[in-house]
Amino acid sequence: MSLSRRRFIQATGATLAASALPLQAQAAETPVALPIPPLLESRRGQPLFLTLQRLHWTFAAGRRAATWGINGGYLGPTVRVYNGDDVNIIYNNRLTEPVAMTVSGLQVPGTLMGGAARMMSPGADWSPVLPIRQTAGTCWYHANTPNRMAPHIYNGLAGLWLVEDAVSKVLPLPNHYGVDDFPLIIQDKRLDNFGQPVYNPPASGGFLGDTLLVNGAQSPFVEVSRGWVRLRLLNASNSRCYQLQLSDGRAMHVVAGDQGFLPAPVPVIRLSLAPGERREILIDMSKGEEVAITAGEAAGLMDRVRGFFEPSSILVNTTVLTLKPTGLLPLVTDNLPMRLLSDQLIDGGISRTREFSLGGSTPDINGALWNMSRNDFQSLQGSFERWIVHTNTPQAFHIQGVAFLIKRVNGNTPLPEDQGWKDTVWVDNEVELLVWFPQVAPDHFPYLYYSQTLEMADRGAAGQFVVRPQSVG
């Protein structure tokens, strides 16, 4: 029987459309195991080496791409330190341009925070000794290079930094790294037809890619035992905020935010993850059913075809990670703890109120662009301040060297999963924060606050402040 003209056009059109799909759309169909960054731990005063370098990585099946990374891999190893340690970090810049590094969420003096005051020229080192004096939390280390933070993080200069303490060691939570406790660094990129990342920042706003990567892989899977699985999430994207959920509609249990545990686990069906934000979740895999974490709706066929001809900000595939349970259910399984913190979150009297207006079309804060030689204000160590942050352009906001509680979101009580100590917050209109200043930052080593839309921060949406020590006597 002859093929009708209509069926011929339909068949050839579908074939052409499939062949025209961007490489990332085709590669996403190939299952790949979740890359798990090596674990780098502080032990007995031995230094931890972090080498910033060029390397090759496979972002799309069968295509090796030139990129950056740390210690030989795309992104960096997971650093794990312990409260009470003094950790000697040795950064070595083997790249061909200056780089500055920092650890977001770490409560250390401004002299040790990194950033513009600690630039590393090509071939240079920076080796701070960091006193770890804070409770358990999931921080992250990353490039903090003035005016170049966005491309440097996009290129791969980032990794997780875990702080453990006496409480986290004894809580009945999964804690076997790479077995039932996994780091997930989420990014969006744009890949060309050779699998090479492309970075073309927009004239305004932040960069949005069309390819979702987790630890540098598209739509990865991981095999897990039947029981509770712990995922430490970091949104290392330049500007995209994710709405995460499980493919079968079951609940995730949020146990921690940026700087520590929540008072108790919070079950959620949908979870927001802003740029720079970290969350820890538990997923019950005891039923032995495969489940995927997703980040919204994927692009349709025409969106994919259109993406072949022009840059797209619609994600081709929105699968973050597929969990595949293996083995038999253990005879004894741990129950989810009813409480995570024995004490209520403590806040103090407010010493003053500050207001911040984050720009949109103009990348400024309170009408001013970042100036390395200008400190915008000073605060007092140990004090609490009320910060009210406004914007007409939704974006994340980060503060170095502090911890804060979200008190109000657009006049309302924050969601239960947002009621722990944090350093990064999504701002869509207005948030009210109670900010605590645990460390000192002198004039020449101030802390930064900035838009976590990295392109906007690079253009000037940042400020800096000093923290004076409490007077004695």
Swiss-Prot record:
Post-translational modification remark: Predicted to be exported by the Tat system. The position of the signal peptide cleavage has not been experimentally proven.
Cell cycle as UniProt keyword: yes
Any Pfam family hit: Cu-oxidase_3
Record-level GO BP terms: FtsZ-dependent cytokinesis
InterPro entries registered for this protein in UniProt: Cu-oxidase-like_N, Cu-oxidase_C, Cu-oxidase_fam, Cupredoxin, FtsP, TAT_signal
Keyword match Cell cycle: yes
Role summary: Cell division protein that is required for growth during stress conditions. May be involved in protecting or stabilizing the divisomal assembly under conditions of stress.
Protein name (Swiss-Prot/TrEMBL): Cell division protein FtsP
Source species of the chain: Sodalis glossinidius (strain morsitans)
Gene label: ftsP
